[in-house]
Swiss-Prot record:
Its main location: cytoplasm. It is an enzyme of class 1 (oxidoreductase). It comes from Synechocystis sp. (strain ATCC 27184 / PCC 6803 / Kazusa). This is Gamma-glutamyl phosphate reductase 2. Catalyzes the NADPH-dependent reduction of L-glutamate 5-phosphate into L-glutamate 5-semialdehyde and phosphate. The product spontaneously undergoes cyclization to form 1-pyrroline-5-carboxylate. Pfam families: Aldedh (PF00171). It is found in: Cytoplasm. GO terms for molecular function: glutamate-5-semialdehyde dehydrogenase activity; NADP binding. It catalyses: L-glutamate 5-semialdehyde + phosphate + NADP(+) = L-glutamyl 5-phosphate + NADPH + H(+). Pathway: Amino-acid biosynthesis; L-proline biosynthesis; L-glutamate 5-semialdehyde from L-glutamate: step 2/2. Belongs to the gamma-glutamyl phosphate reductase family. It comes from the Bacteria. Keywords: Amino-acid biosynthesis, Cytoplasm, NADP, Oxidoreductase, Proline biosynthesis. One of its GO terms (biological process) is L-proline biosynthetic process.
Length: 420
């Protein structure tokens, strides 16, 4: 395929996605919910087809010596697919988010002012190794009246193509525009920048994957970008913090499957910490298969438990079951260190002191701050109506948990009295 053919193919996909978005305006919330349910049902009866395609991707990834974490994220199971179906069915059951009316932040004289939520337009999801994200993002987009363009990177092309085809079958069954969900194969657009640099036809780009991948895609984007964050979350262990609480916070944060978004990978230890509980924690984590690292001071104290962490590791995500420990002078120093080294999307403190918890909560510049509770991330939480695609650490309207609100924008309506 020539570069001209690839460019023409990309334009066709984006034009069709734009047309589908405009057509969705004529469908009500019940229609869109019915389509999300139809996509869920189409996926549910196609597990064998998806897993077969996924097997091809796994073979390719092994031949390419892909990183272990990417292979783990890539490998689909019936359980992961069933969880995706469950998320889509829950999305279908939620009230129409476009019917939400919010109070305006300010009012005009002699007029009533309010905000109505509206869809964004055409959303692009650019991701590596998470095939089921294609279906979840499709549900979020369709529920909010947006169209979605998928661009997988790495070795997930067969899985993405199969999932996209099945989602489009669901849209066809529901009699909604099939181009509401489309996939751009790597052979059609080998250069991702051709897609994410298209500000005239895309209204939002969501890069999802390793932090280095997300940053690379974000730097190439000309449309608005919503960066998903992962890993490198910090925990400050106060001398007033309970050992069992710290242990539970660390272990539970690594439970998310396949991507423990809020995994605690760094622990800052207060100077007044008793060595005995720290040894018990290190022993427990080692027994559970964690790899443990530390700064020079702690490695000297606990040579049987810790290996020395390089200086550049404190600002990077491990993305595996690795936790690094570091001493800190005091809470103020810990806050400054976290603000300059963590990913900034989910940081924690373990303490029995209200004053310390308040100082930490106000001082740490993170999207989510957890006090004496594991920062466990779940796309499909048991309680409430909220569902989440991921977490973002960027500043602005879409900071924090990426829910349905991230796929909508407010329109302010100013209504005066009729003079007729």
């Amino acid at each position: 395929m020539t570069s001209d053919d690839a460019a023409a193919g990309l334009v066709r996909v984006l034009d069709a996605a734009q047309g589908a978005f405009l057509a969705l305006d004529s469908y009500g919330g019940n229609d869109r919910s019915r389509a999300v349910l139809a996509m869920a049902e189409a996926l549910e009866r196609s597990f064998a087809q998806i897993l077969e395609a996924n097997t091809l991707d796994l073979v390719v990834s092994r031949e390419m010596s892909v990183a272990d974490c990417l292979c783990e994220w890539l490998k689909l199971t019936p359980e992961r697919l069933q969880n995706t179906v469950t998320i889509l069915k829950r999305l279908a059951s939620l009230p129409d988010p476009l019917q939400r009316v919010m109070a305006s932040p300010y009012q005009f004289n002699l007029a009533q002012t309010y905000c109505q939520l509206m869809p964004l337009g055409v959303v692009a999801l650019v991701y590596e190794s998470f095939p089921e994200l294609a279906a979840i993002a499709a549900g979020f987009c369709l529920k909010t009246g947006n169209s979605l363009v998928l661009r997988s990177c790495g070795a997930s092309s067969h899985s993405t193509a199969a999932i996209c085809e099945i989602l489009r079958e669901g849209l066809l069954d529901a009699d909604l525009p099939v181009d509401s969900v489309s996939h751009i194969p790597s052979e059609t657009s080998p250069n991702v920048q051709d897609l994410v640099g298209n500000a005239s036809q895309l209204n939002l780009v969501i890069p999802y994957g390793r932090p280095s991948f997300v940053e690379q895609i974000s730097q190439q984007c000309t449309p608005p970008v919503l960066k998903a964050a992962m890993g490198n979350c910090y925990l400050y262990w106060s001398s007033k913090g309970d050992l069992e609480m710290v242990r539970q916070m660390i272990i539970d944060s690594h439970v998310g499957h396949p991507d423990p978004v809020n995994a605690i990978e760094k622990v800052l230890v207060s100077p007044g910490q008793n060595p005995a509980p720290l040894v018990r924690l290190l022993n427990n984590l080692q027994a559970k298969g964690f790899k443990l690292r530390g700064d020079a001071e702690l490695c000297e104290q606990f040579p049987d438990h810790l290996t020395l962490a390089k200086e550049n590791e404190w600002g990077k995500a491990y993305l595996d079951r690795t936790v690094a420990f570091r001493t800190t002078q005091n809470l103020k120093t810990a806050i400054a260190w976290i603000n300059s080294h963590s990913s900034g999307h989910g940081d924690c403190i373990a303490t029995d002191s209200y004053q310390e918890s308040r100082q930490f909560s106000m001082g740490v510049d993170s999207a989510l701050v957890y006090v004496n509770i594991p920062p466990y991330f779940c796309r499909n939480p048991r309680h409430g109506e909220s569902l989440f695609l991921g977490v973002s650490s960027q500043k602005g309207q879409r900071r924090g948990l990426i829910g349905l609100e991230a796929f909508m924008t407010p329109k302010q309506i100013v209504q005066g009295e009729s003079r007729s």
